[in-house]
Amino acid sequence: MKLSKDFKEIKGDASFRKFYRNKKKNSIIVFANKEKPKNLLIYDSINKILIKNNLIAPKLLSQNYENNYIEIQDLGNKTIYQIFLKNKKNQYFIFKKIINVLNKIQLIKDKKIKNFKNIFYKIEDYKNKILFDEAKLFSYWYIPKKLNKKKIRIFNVKFSIEIKQLLSKLNFKNDTFVHRDFHVSNLVVNSKNQIGLIDNQDALIGNKAYDLASLIDDVRFKTSNSLKVKVYNYYLKTNKKINADKFKNDFEILSVLRNLKIIGIFMRLAVRDKKTKYLKLIPYAWKMIDNRLAKNKDLNSLKLLLASNFPKFINK
């Protein structure tokens, strides 16, 4: 792909995409020759839905789908993750602003929109099968590197049973817009000091607790348990109609499943894609899993399975 000298490559994420910033035009080229529909067509569709609902997301400036790229508005390079690294004083205040954005996201009713090819895109439901398959990334990629062959077979059978049981215990319906990667690295502060959303292509209609679990138990950014509790309580305070007990149950189950998935993804990145930098984040993912397992009796059986195989990370 040939670009003018005005475009500078941006350090990429864990996906197959490449990004190029043009500061003169205030734009970014998103290039994707793998998983093209998701990374270009669906990405733009989700952005359109967010913008339609008065949220800040990158607008499409131009598209060249045949040559594997789109040009989008540049929201800037100041992520909340970067702000937090520089200043730890106002984190709770900023988290409250993030929760206000999340509340706005969760009011979205649109499920369908026309993409730039003039074809309707409909957001899919976050079905239990998807959650199950995501959790199985842990057993598919991480387990073979950590257990012997005999243990692998036994673990995988038991693990599948545990995950299915946990999914059957979720209370909330799939009726809420879920970003799926709602964390401080994907939240950008623009020139007007407003919070914008990036990396939006994975959105589904799912459980209300998922994005909050993604934000609070974020593997890339360590927060104290006391801050986690404060942010969680602020969400409940701004959503008084929610059944707190049922919500807590779903939050804890989804947090554990998400971080098991993430461990699997990080091992896959290392083994398949030779991207080893994410391996150092795995111990913190384990720490958050252990923290949530200790708080929900419905997770006891999974806790025992993990503790018997990974006593270094999970307390019995």
Briefly describe each language-model feature range:
Residues 1, 110, 117-118, 122, ...:
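An alpha-helical support segment within catalytic cores of ATP-dependent transferases
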Residues 2-21:
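ATP-binding glycine-rich phosphate-binding loop
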Residues 10-14, 62-65, 254-255:
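A short beta-turn/loop motif at secondary-structure boundaries
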Residues 16-23, 105-106, 164-212, 219-223:
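Active-site acidic catalytic loop and adjacent metal/ATP-binding pocket
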Residues 20-133, 171-172:
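ATP-binding pocket architecture of kinase catalytic cores
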Residues 136-146, 208-242, 256-273, 285-292:
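Active-site activation/catalytic loop segments of kinase-like enzymes and analogous catalytic loops
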Residues 242-252:
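Acidic, serine/threonine- and proline-rich low-complexity regulatory regions
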Residues 264-316:
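ATP/Mg2+ or Mg2+-diphosphate-binding catalytic cores
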